[in-house]
Amino acid sequence: MATVPKPARGGTAVEALVGQPTVLNPLFETNDSTRDVNSLIYQGLTSVDAQQNVVGVLATDWTVSPDHLTYTFNIRDGVKWADGQPFGADDVLFTFHILQDLEYQQPGADVWRQVGVSAGGSGQVVFTLRAPEASFPLTLRVGIIPKHIYTGMAPAQIASSPFSGVRAFGTGPFKVGSINQLAITLDRNPNAVPQPYLDHLVLRTYPATDPQLAIRAVLTGAADLVGGIQPQEVDTLLGRNGLTVLEARMFTNSFVSFNSDGDGKSFFGDPKVRLALVQAVDRQKIVSEVLAGRADADPNPIPTAGWAYSASAASLHPYDAIAAAKNLEAAGWLADPATKIRAKKGTSFKVMMVAADSYPNQQIAEALARQLLAIGIQVDVKLLPASKLLQDYLLTRKYQMALISIDVGADPDQYWLWHSGTEGGAVNFAYARGWGIIDKDLEDGRAAVDPPSRLAVYIDFQMVMADLAPAIFLYSGHYVYAVSQRVHGVHVNKAIEPSDRFQYVTDWYVNTSG
């Protein structure tokens, strides 16, 4: 009888990583590729399982006070850092105190400064909130750093330390072995639990400006894995001998925001007009033609991958170009017989939409403009570098329409994105008027602790958003990961954030026995 090969320790796998990682410290992540590497080195108190439940990693469990303001986390015993030193509650306290340090100027610092962090009983850390926030345990996915290495250092010194680079280590499955201009070599952490089968994982870096180079590396055998493959590239990988293509949903949302308070008020102040534009867009056609079908047409603010996604809300206002035209006419926007462009009181319906100048944003913006032109709305597309779009338009709200693609995370809490009371200096799309019911749903969703109550609130949130139409919600994307059959045991959850592709990296193997 044939013997089934069993996974054996040893060997090396190579991933073609798109983008250049920077500071290998989870407190100073600046891009996706850095987050990818850090997820292999560091661990947080919590993570998300395949069913989207928040589960403990460096915490075994936690309790919540009756007023939902105090979370007491029990820190896991017996964990060691990669250098052999014991991990404990002091490391957790140290990490979060750095996040609260006034010299720490990374995004989100102000949020952490509003959270009380203190020692509890033996092996416990206590977090105290100013207001209930049901999604709080998920925010504790941030990687914990070793106090015995960084104690006495200011945040800037921590970021520039060799332990945030060529000597980086944590409690995760790997630690940095070496770094050069072409690759980061990670070595197995001898103290990790569970132990990876792989001795080494090499992350060979390729420029974000030319991701095809990373794909070519897998096709030529220079690398074993490549992720984040754009939809138009997938067909070059499907059917290739020796390659498996994995696909998972992501917690991203792509939508067009209407600026109803500022530059777009004269066009989008009327909710009937906004709703007409929502009805005028054929999402499925965009997904099919621009994204090769590798996304979910999604009319909701909560992605289709999310546990609180409402199919009922998604079906409230389906694509109907005829109804859209009638609603525009009812709102006083009449088509000019000669130009076919709609006008009202002498003002033509001509607006500007800003979008990032990269794939697929440019192609989606142009497809949207064509669809809206078909019902008499002229949309001029202005393409910009992503950084300029953020700084000069989204943060300042100096736009009429804006195409946005954003990772909203696994939890349905979108307070930061849609609540009208959010402080300035952050991306937010709430309106100044008529927003009370949305605010209440977002507040109630944070305050509710049990999943059924939260689900009911977020279903209502999606229903109201569908009727108010503050945006044209378009699609939620898929993550595509190509894996050489030389590497076994690679699997991902049905819905992930990009760095979650490494969640089960300890199952990967290239060597077998038996």
Show the residue positions of the predicted features.
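N-terminal lobe/hinge region of extracytoplasmic solute-binding protein
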Residues: A16-P66, H97, F169-G170
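Aromatic- and charge-enriched surface segment that lines or borders ligand/interaction sites
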Residues: T60-Q105, V126-T128, A214-T220, F267-F268
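Surface-exposed binding/hinge segments that line
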Residues: G108-M153
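Gly/Pro-rich hinge or "lid" segments in bacterial periplasmic/extracellular proteins
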Residues: V142-P196, H200, A321-K326, V510-G514
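Ligand-site clamp/hinge motif
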Residues: P162, P190-T236, A369, Q378-D380, ...
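Ligand/substrate-recognition segments at binding pockets and active sites
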Residues: Q181, L334-V408, P451
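Detector for C-terminal structural segments
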Residues: R188, A280-A311, Y359-A369, L390-G514
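Structural transition elements
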Residues: A297-P337, A356-Q363
